[in-house]
Amino acid sequence: MESWSAPEVPALPGRGPQLRLYDSADRQVRPVSAGDTATMYVCGITPYDATHLGHAATYLAFDLVHRLWLDAGHRVHYVQNITDVDDPLFERAARDGIDWRDLGAREIQLFREDMAALRVLPPHDYVAATDAIAEVIELVEKMLASGAAYVVDDPEFPDVYYRADATVQFGYESNYDHETMLTLFAERGGDPDRAGKADELDALLWRAERPGEPSWPSPFGPGRPGWHVECAAIALSRIGTGLDIQGGGSDLIFPHHEFSAAHAESVTGERRFARHYVHAGMIGWDGHKMSKSRGNLVLVSRLRAEGVDPSAIRLGLLAGHYREDRFWSDDVLSDAQTRLQRWRRATSLPTGPDATDVLARVRTYLADDLDTPKALIALDAWCTEALDGGGSDVTAPKTVATAVDALLGVALPVE
């Protein structure tokens, strides 16, 4: 599937340092040991609603990873999926009286426009679940053959399930206890009470055909994929084993990332699906959790329609650390707009303070678990000195503007 147009990433002098990120499985910040080509799989949207700031914050975090890898001299193979066959999509389409495919296509296009406006680098492979049915079927067949999966004893709906105990390491990614797993499994799309399952935590791999639902033929009967297996199949088919980063929002730690990793591991025999499991925090609005039920979603497209500069949206989200749950507010946006104006004024000056030190510090801060708050403060200090008339380096304003563009994805004027 087509993604969106890529913004140009300008080159900076020298190379950035090795990236260090917090790994949810190991619960510590450690180096990301990528090869010449760094690989990353980030879970994409379920296209039944517009992109809100929680989505945007997640994709901005991994956009920074992408940019820092490029700055460190890596090629990047980035894969993102689209969960375009799932219950929330069908439910919203039925509510609105629209075909689920048309709803998905509309929201995917809006997502593309939002990502392009925010200057997010597109994935190398942008894959809809409906375009990966063959890969899913192949993976489920392998799990059935190995005993990692089974068909429930239900003549009407013979669904295929994954055995949660199929790998001895199951649970390592989330580090959650059994009770927490069960709670989150029920809250986040699981079906612990499904009759015929061997264990409450066993996860759906293939949902047998139901009336009114799309389905595809398979050796184990017509149906459609479960959620977690889609990502395992797409990642394995596009990247293979030895994935550097599996990423997404913190709400995907369990069950989604735990199971997608386990599905892949049960087939490949690898101990770890990914070397790093990286998760972004949640975004709330004005002191409350952002949710559809509250009706307080802040949509990127709505902000753009109101005339908000996408670079200000980007700076507002980057003002907080990516792993922290944090709140968006009018004050956050106002502060970001003020910061953007100051940066643009400073980098438009004919001269400024030498940029060597600020470039080195910004690179160092970002490479240390994407510490954007420190990076932004370092840039603020340079801009303040420049606006106060300090420095006589004629190349510095352009160097700083180029660094902000290349590393943070924020476009500033460069003469």
Curated annotation (Swiss-Prot):
InterPro entries: Cys-tRNA/MSH_ligase, Mycothiol_ligase_MshC, Rossmann-like_a/b/a_fold, tRNA-synt_1_cat_dom. A motif ('ERGGDP' region) lies at residues 187-192. Zn(2+) binds at C43, C231, H256. One of its GO terms (biological process) is mycothiol biosynthetic process. Its cofactor is Zn(2+). One of its GO terms (molecular function) is cysteine-glucosaminylinositol ligase activity. Keywords: ATP-binding, Ligase, Metal-binding, Nucleotide-binding, Zinc. Its EC number is 6.3.1.13. L-cysteinyl-5'-AMP binds at C43, G44, I45, T46, T58, N81, I82, T83, W227, G249, S250, D251, I283. A motif ('HIGH' region) lies at residues 45-55. Belongs to the class-I aminoacyl-tRNA synthetase family. MshC subfamily. Monomer. This is L-cysteine:1D-myo-inositol 2-amino-2-deoxy-alpha-D-glucopyranoside ligase. It comes from Mycobacterium sp. (strain KMS). The lineage of its organism: Bacteria, Bacillati, Actinomycetota, Actinomycetes, Mycobacteriales.
